[in-house]
Regions:
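Acidic/hydrophobic-patterned starts of short beta strands in beta-sheet-rich repeat architectures
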Residues: 42-52, 92-101, 152-162
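Beta-propeller blade termini and top-face loops
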Residues: 35, 102-103, 110-113, 145
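A short loop-to-beta-strand structural motif that recurs across blades of beta-propeller domains
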Residues: 57-60, 105-107, 167-169
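Residue-level signature of beta-propeller blades and closely related beta-rich strand-turn architectures
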Residues: 52-54, 102-104, 112, 162-164, ...
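Beta-propeller blade termini
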Residues: 32-40, 81-90, 141-150
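Blade-edge motifs of beta-propeller repeat domains
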Residues: 3-29, 62-80, 112-140, 175-191
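Repeat-solenoid scaffold signature
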Residues: 137-175
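Beta-strand-rich domains and repeat architectures in extracellular enzymes and scaffolds
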Residues: 16-55
Length: 191
């Protein structure tokens, strides 16, 4: 019905002004960039992905010995994202996965790349144990959570502002405690 096409430009052209070549002439502008690393071309080197929340645009850049080359062909491998997107390795397999906004919370996509960059939805809404109930971890669309191993136990925890924004909530990832592996999505609200 109203399908959208993804067009990839021929970026092999050199654009110059006064004899000076622009290094990323076709990448467009960035207004509210969120920067993450991922191995886009599976060569063992971390590349760069910029998510611009002002247009929900993903801009991939290949790391060529410290020179970042705009590579729009990788955009189609990413799921549709809006408001925010961060890349971090949730399951400790050495491949950065996608954390992104999802209806008052967040979704996680696993990096399933083998020969080509690919992702698979793990959960469309991450829950946390608030004592007696499992509720979604609220993450505002105007903010970005911190996703890091806060307690140094080997799995990624989440820091986010409370729903009213008055304080920071700590959601401890219980994967290592429950299974001994970090490939489980199991969070617990911790004060």
């Amino acid at each position: 019905s109203f399908s959208q096409m993804i067009l990839n430009r021929d970026t092999s052209l050199t654009i110059t002004e006064n004899g000076i070549a622009f290094s990323s002439a076709f990448s467009g502008g960035i207004n509210s960039g969120q920067f993450s690393e991922i191995d886009l071309n599976l060569d063992g080197t971390m590349d760069l992905v910029v998510f611009d929340k002002s247009g929900n645009k993903i801009s991939p850049f290949i790391n060529d010995n410290g020179n970042y080359i705009y590579a729009p062909k990788y955009r189609s491998a990413f799921p549709k994202a809006h408001d925010w997107m961060l890349l971090a390795d949730y399951n400790c397999d050495g491949k950065n996965d996608i954390y992104t906004y999802s209806s008052g919370g967040m979704a996680i996509y696993e990096n399933t790349s083998t020969t080509n960059l690919s992702f698979s939805l793990i959960t469309s809404l991450v829950l946390s144990n608030y004592g007696s109930n499992n509720l979604n971890i609220y993450i505002s669309p105007v903010d970005i959570p911190a996703i890091a191993d806060i307690d140094y136990d080997g799995d990624l925890d989440i820091l986010t502002f409370s729903i009213l924004g008055g304080f920071v909530e700590y959601h401890k990832n219980m994967a290592m405690e429950l299974t001994g592996n970090c490939d489980t999505v199991a969070f617990e609200f911790s004060e």
